[in-house]
Amino acid sequence: MSLEALNSRISYVAQDQYLFNTSLLENIRMGRLNATDEEVLEAARKAQCMEFLEKLPQGIHSMAGDAGKMLSGGQRQRISLARAILKDAPIVVLDEATAYADPENEEKMEAAIAELVKDKTLVVIAHKLPAIMNADQICVVDTANWLRQESIRT
C-alpha cells in the first residue's frame, strides 16, 4: 500500500490544531477537497460547530485568522473534528484531541467524536483514563516500548 493510499484511510485529530488563514468553510473542506458546501456544513453540524459559527460576522465564511487564533482552542479542535468527519476515513486517530478543551467544549467534542467514530476503527492517544474508558482494548506504551495490552471490559 502506498503512503498516499494509507493516508486516504486515516483521519487524524491532533492535540494542537492548525487552521489556515482562509475561511472556516475552506478549513473544514481540507478534509475532502471535492466536498460540496452542503457537505461541509453537515460536517460542521455533526462536529458541534454551528453554535459558534453562527455568532461570527460572516458565519462559516469568516476568516480563521493567522493559525486560527480568532477561535478558542476548543473551537479549533471542533473545526478539526469537522474535517475528520468530512473525510470519513475508516481509521480515526485522536491524539489528545480534547486536551485543551474546557468542560463545555469537552462535552460538545465528545458528542462530535461519537459522531465521527461510528463504524470506524479508533485509535486514541491519551494520558487521562476517562478519555479511554469506552475502549475495547487498551495498549500501554512508554517511550516507544509496548508494555501491555488488555481489555477493560468484563
Language model features: what each stretch is:
Residues 7-16, 24-27, 41-49, 61-154:
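ABC-family ATPase nucleotide-binding domain "signature/switch" substructure
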Residues 32, 53, 68-70:
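Short basic coil micro-motifs at the edges of alpha-helical modules that engage polyanionic partners
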Residues 29-37, 51:
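ABC-type ATPase nucleotide-binding domains, specifically the catalytic core motifs of the NBD
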Residues 21:
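The conserved phosphate-sensing helix
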